Structures are given as C-alpha cells and as structure tokens.
Amino acid sequence: MSTPLIAGTGPSAVRQLISNAVQNDPVSGNFRCRRDIFTDAALFDYEMKYIFEQNWVFLAHESQVANPDDYLVSNIGRQPVIITRNKAGDVSAVINACSHRGAELCRRKQGNRSTFTCQFHGWTFSNTGKLLKVKDGQDDNYPEGFNVDGSHDLTRIPSFANYRGFLFGSMNPDACPIEEHLGGSKAILDQVIDQTPGELEVLRGSSSYIYDGNWKLQIENGADGYHVGSVHWNYVATIGRRDRTSDTIRTVDVTTWSKKNIGGTYTFEHGHMLLWTRLPNPEVRPVFARREELKARVGEEVADAIVNQTRNLCIYPNLYVMDQISTQIRVVRPISVDKTEVTIYCFAPRDESEEVRNARIRQYEDFFNVSGMGTPDDLEEFRACQSGYRGSAREWNDLSRGAPHWISGPDDNARRLGLAPLMSGARMEDEGLFVQQHTYWAETMLRGIEAEPKVFNVQPVEVAQ
C-alpha cells in the first residue's frame, strides 16, 4: 500500500530520507520508522523550519503572565520570543532580539517590566515592541528615513492565539485557526480545563533539564504505555508496597494498568495523540472531590472521564498536558539533533484549597519532578536510544505492537465522549499512535520541501509506506 505524498527525484539525501521514513502498511504488516530520522543533522534544520516555525507551537499559559507588565520568554523553533501583558491586560508576543544589532533583550526567564532596554547599545522598547528611545538618537546621528512607520519596532509574531488560557504562536502568517489545528485533541484539552468552573494556573517554580537525545524521543514517550512496567518498575513496585491507609503520599495506583487492560490510545489530526487509562482508585486525585459539581456542569459522561480517566495529551509538536499521577505541563524545545531541553510545570485550579494543593504538589514531586522516580528513568532510555540509533546495522524501529486490534476511527469510549480520533488503540501499550504521528511528520516536512522547488527539484511521486 502507498500514500501519495510529495517528494523529489534529485540528489537531496534529506528529501529521500523523509520520503522513505515511515512504513504504514497493513497488507505487509510493516509499521515502522527509520532510526536515522532521529540522528540526521541536516534533517533537524528542516524540522525546525517546517515542524516548529511554520506550525503552531505552545508558548506559555496565560497565568504565567497574570499581571500587567509581566513577561515570560519562550521559543518558536529557533526564534526567541517574549510573551508580555501590557497595562491594558492584552497579551502579545514579539521576537526577543533588539531591532538594532540583534542582541537578546530579555535574559531572564520571566519578570515584570513595562519597557525593555537593550544592554548592548541602550535602545529602549515598550513591552508591546514599540521603539521608544534610541541612545544618542538626536541631531544628525541617523539618516532621515530612520525609524519611520515602526520600521525599528520589535518584530511581532505573525500568528498568536489564546485557546482557553493556552498560548500558541507560529512564524507562519497564514497559519490555520488554532481551533482547527487542535482538531479532535481540543475535546481532551477541554476536559483538563473544565475541571474547575474558574481558572487554571501554573504554580510557581519550574524544572528544566537537557537530555542527550532527539526531541521526538520525548514526544513519543509521553504517550508510550508499553514502557511503564519495564522502565518505571521501581516506581510501580514502590506504589505496590505503600500502605495506602497511612499518612504517606497517596497516589494513583499504576500497578494494575497493564494487567487489567483499562486504557487505550487515540490519534488526532496534525500529529496530536492521547494515552488514557481508567483509574482503579480515583479518590486519591484532587478532582475527585468535584465530581458532583462536574456532573451538573459538563454532564455525567464527560464528568466521569474527567474524574475516572487519566490523560497524557500530546499537542504536537512541543507540548504534553499530563493529568494522571499529578497535573503537569511539559514543554519540549529541540536544541540540536541529539540534545533536547524539557521544561515542566505543575498546574492546578486556582480556587483549590491549601490541603488539596499540597497533596497535588506532593504527588507531582513523587513521580514527575527532576528528582522524582520517573524522569531520571526516562532520560537514561532516551540517551540509550540515541546512542543505539547511531549504528547502521539495523535501520528501522518496529512500531507494530497492537496492530491486530487497532481501530480506524473511534472506539466505544471515544463515541461515548463524543470524540473523533483518526485511530483508536484498544490497549494502552499499543504503538499505532506513533506510526500516525510520524506519518504526519513526513507529510508536513514534504509539503515544506515542495515550497522550495529551486532547492530540492521537487516532483510529485508515490511514497511507499
């Protein structure tokens, strides 16, 4: 079986790699992706352009710039960005580089400033990007046409959107509406947001770490139910040994997820995907106390999912919203082909009690934090995979687990919740969601290449999968 994509017939190794990167063939039973898409440095440069800079990417949550003149720095691929809130309460985003000689303006992660002054030559800008003052800009130091009609203001992000507090940006001025980009994953994000009739907030503090591996390793792993019992066996065993009647941390019981087959996976448009499970002990989660209010506000079926199901939601290409052992926003920033930065935050309903907030944070620290029982395990596997991918003896990663029971379209759980996934995995260990995501990756990359015919000598062909 083959899917018509766009590829070239010229000598470009990058183009040829993308064209043959993914096999998604039910007839032959080949469901796999090439390992060198994780190691090719030339390919990485095009990923930054087509996957990150021309796509919508997550920038921040609006609670991180809650007050007038708050700012937070972020990235759209290789482009440094400042997200600001002005005195009128409006949130906007500009490139974090002085319009004079390109020096980075904001050199701290976040703060509160009504103006930004470049440390290099002293130019001053409003926090919405307008050039206010040029050092020694009077008299005849500059030509007559200098700073006309905003020519030297900071560069605004071409596309900027706020979906219910989640802020996204793109360097593509023709990016589709954010709701269209989110597609079917929007309903899952709504489940997270609707846990409170009020607002969510990102809690103070964050953790950032860099691992030695490609960015796609983390994007796969956040929805990989297959690795839990082997990589996180120590955490699973620890949970099994804990006395849940004592005053120790009470957390989600992960010991029965795989044994009882109480979960699955969904893939959505634009590379988004979901890993979900049914909770054996939902009473340990903070949202459990809101179940009656939720039923009245969002309906019994959705309330049941919010309270009794976990969610590992990937908003492709750089965001995970985790709602399981605790609640986490995980932001992925590629640095190079084999180096990736991850920044993690805990989020919560703004109106929850101190007791519930403390329990949430303890659960978060237990597994998610850099010093928790989960993160170090994953980072070692990312390093080991990246090292193994450098070998050339075997070219492919097998992604066929669960293929006999993958479902095209929604399963019963999805239909009950009004979801419309492209594909459903009947078990949480199923790997079909990675095949779908990498297929979208290849399609997006090849569409970008098609727009550069002079570079790639592009012609339409059939790309075997």
Swiss-Prot record:
Residues 56-154 form the Rieske domain. Its EC number is 1.14.12.13. Keywords: 2Fe-2S, Aromatic hydrocarbons catabolism, Dioxygenase, Iron, Iron-sulfur, Metal-binding, NAD, Oxidoreductase, Plasmid. It holds the Pfam family Ring_hydroxyl_A. [2Fe-2S] cluster binds at C98, H100, C118, H121. Its cofactor is [2Fe-2S] cluster; Fe(2+). This is 2-halobenzoate 1,2-dioxygenase large subunit. It comes from Burkholderia cepacia.
